Amino acid sequence: MTDISYYNNEIDKILWNILGDDYFTQDEFDDLVNSVANTIYQYDNEVSIDKLKVIIEFVILNKFKICYIYDNDSILNQVKYEKKSVGSKTIGKNSTNDDEDDDEDIAVIKLSDIEAGENWFKKSPKISSKQFQSVDKVEVATYEDLISHKHDYPKEIYKESHYIRRNTRLDVIKKIPQFEQKSKEWLKQRTESLTATAISVVFDEDPYKHPIVILLDKCGRGLPFVENKFVHHGNKYEQIGTMFYSFRNNVEVGEYGLLQHSGHKFIAASPDGICSKKANTGGLSKLVGRLLEIKFPFSREINNSGDLDGDICPHYYFLQVQTQLYVTEMDECDFLQCKIDEYDSWEDFVKDSNPIVPGLSKTTNLEKGCLIQLSDKNLIGSDDKEKCLYNSKYIYPPKLHMTNEEIEKWISSEIMNYHNNDLSENYMIDRVIYWRLSQVTCNLIKLNKEAFEEKIPLLQQFWDYVLFYRQHSDKLDKLIKFVEKVKEDNSAEIFSYINEDFLSLNKDSKYEPLYQEETEWRKKYNQIKAKKAQMYKNKSYNKYTKFSN
């Protein structure tokens, strides 16, 4: 049987013709293997084509090291394979290095040693194409190799003007008083403004709500918020997303609560985070002032292609980010989307451990970890399982990339010392949840200030309507009855009524009714809604016809 060194030499020749000294990505790997295999098989068919592919995979992955490509401007997660080096030289067909250790190691391996490649592939799991991107060209031998240093700022003080401006603005934001949650001041602040999550609705560019819903809510007559599985899932894992982003980008991420625009107090936003200094050394970062918005979709697919506004980032989230940028007076936001899986057991969690890097999933090559779920004592035994879940609170680990032993010690410590936790009076430990990230995308969104400011007059008029009905509860009661009659999706008729009401007591106003024409986004949503309705109608008709016959 032909020795492995023979195939090593043949593969080298073909790779040089295809790649030269270039690299290839994970997405190109299968095509590369097929090309090399088909070429060799034309003149040497001693082994089957399938076994030949296994040999080629083995040889190539011994010659190339895995690197990560991280670029916030990119919509793709990629893995890059770059030629391994010996000393300071690159191994390749034209290499003059006399000490080519990697090739010598391959040469002494027999075909029987890699029988179908099974043992080797078990030891060296491939990196998933869903891997979070990293610009740093490093072999991952430790979790610290996962940190991107792309955004580290090398100087002791900021020199570039845009970093100086962001840092100065961040200092101002840090000094803004933050009120205790649920306090009178906290509640009052929320009644004084339209928050970022409401802006898409006020623009009539939200698929789920119509503008009148926000107006009634701001007048204290809206439906009470009821948490659902989608909101709870996002809130539950938001801190994990922050920890992941902070670690991978070597940056501290701070939370600053609800912020109001300096000139338009009726517009407010609360970003998930704002970046500041480097996390590991406290030095400067080029990410200073960049906002972070995190989404953990419960069922929505994460899209990596198409338009940033609408396809990759759903339009209502895009407007949320634009509002956050406008309010904070920053210019960039990273939109981080993560898919997360929960393990069924500790045993499954342990089995899925990366053999080299603690805290990485062997399956996804993304972070994994745990958190402790706490349940409300007053709801123990309740038949309302959803209410029990949505009232849960969580204890998060101090860091990512803990070894399994460290995780066990942390869980034991939290349980033993839980009586010292402030939450222990009203909450009890329910269970430990083990999770892994399965997909991560990070896309840079920049402020379009001109486009946003074009909508300020609409927001101002809408807010004037809110203030008007707050002062005239009798007219608000009549408005509610009118909305019940015409239905909340009839925005044109509702806001004609509202504008007439407003002008009756504001004779000098030049306001024209809002929402007299459908926005382009509303048209798009209505088309999608109509298609779905027709689809369900057809299904129901077919089902009826089937049973009728």
Curated annotation (Swiss-Prot):
InterPro entries linked to this entry: Lambda-type_endonuclease, NF-kappa-B_Signaling_Reg, PDDEXK-like_dom_sf, Restrct_endonuc-II-like, YqaJ_viral_recombinase
Lineage summary: Viruses, Varidnaviria, Bamfordvirae, Nucleocytoviricota, Megaviricetes
Protein name per its UniProtKB record: Uncharacterized protein R354
Superkingdom, taxonomy of origin: Viruses
